[in-house]
Amino acid sequence: MASELCKTISVARLEKHKNLFLNYRNLQHFPLELLKDEGLQYLERLYMKRNSLTTLPENLAQKLPNLVELYLHSNNIVVVPEAIGSLVKLQCLDLSDNALEIVCPEIGRLRALRHLRLANNQLQFLPPEVGDLKELQTLDISTNRLLTLPERLHLCLSLQYLTVDRNRLWCVPRHLCQLPSLNELSMAGNRLAFLPLDLGRSRELQYVYVDNNIHLKGLPSFLYNKVIGCSGCGAPIQVSEVKLLSFSSGQLTVFLPAEVKAIGTEKDHILPLQELAMRTLHHNYHASLKDLDFLSPVSLPRSLLELLHCPLGHCHRCSEPMFTIVYPKLFPLRETPMAGLHQGRTTVSFVAYCCSTQCLQTFDLLS
């Protein structure tokens, strides 16, 4: 086996192969023959599926500087090492079905990366530096142990497909609603009890799958007329079991995002002072060409300054930004034309989040 491996690599070196297939070789270590002398300078794609690798060499980028695809599916790699950040031409990295516990921050240096697949590992978090991957189009981190996603993920301006199925997510950063290119979002099999208010506001986002999030009872009305999957959602549960603000209408109850501080009703004609102040500051912020210098560094807490950049959501009726209070209105899915797709048995509702009593009274999902 060793001699056959050496021969394969030697031929690739002599003939300046661009693709090298070392799948199913029972390799426990990265082949030294790949790293000898100047390495394989012409190699662009390396496939090493179903081996027993536990780590990657520190000089990988030095010996294989032109790699655009590295396929390491089904190995035993525990850590994505710092050296990975030096593969500046890498476009596709597949580390699915390994034993990954840590992804190093240096992964953010892979500025050419377009496809990152980390499914079926042991990851509990992603480094914020993932947000530096401006060319990233596909991110698959399904079947891990993630509790949340980094807020900076919304800086992945080219991201089109995000898959985080079968993790332990209990919330999704509202910042992800700002992803300008996101077309498909799949979060099935998590622990979500609510979704960001603005999810679905982007016209680019067309497919959202949240199946089997049993505590999830409300879908933002922006998702109406999108392709959605919500089977297994809205299971009966005592509201006291979930420590979140909830809103009820008739026999229906939905949980609201943790950032929501108050719920308005048709009787609340006057907005809270903090909400009025935040809306005024937000308008001034945009009127001053997004220059917050008119605010002194100590005039607002950091959390409120951050809210100015990324509001809680936008009114589903008039697009007015909202910061602390929302006026919700429920539309049971079973009473919409979409009921047939779910055999009319779902207890999930569409939720319109409005900014005032006027918008609350005039919003109509079906009009």
Curated annotation (Swiss-Prot):
Keyword Chaperone recorded: no
LRR repeats: 16-36, 42-63, 66-87, 89-110, 112-133, 135-156, 158-180, 181-202, 204-226
Pfam families registered for this protein in UniProt: LRR_14, LRR_8
Gene3D superfamilies tied to this protein: Ribonuclease Inhibitor
Listed SUPFAM superfamilies: L domain-like
SMART domains with a match to the protein in the record: LRR_BAC (SM00364), LRR_TYP (SM00369)
Entry keyword set: Leucine-rich repeat, Repeat
Highest rank taxon of the organism: Eukaryota
A single GO cellular-component term on record: cytoplasm
Protein name, per record: Leucine-rich repeat-containing protein 28
Organism, as annotated: Bos taurus
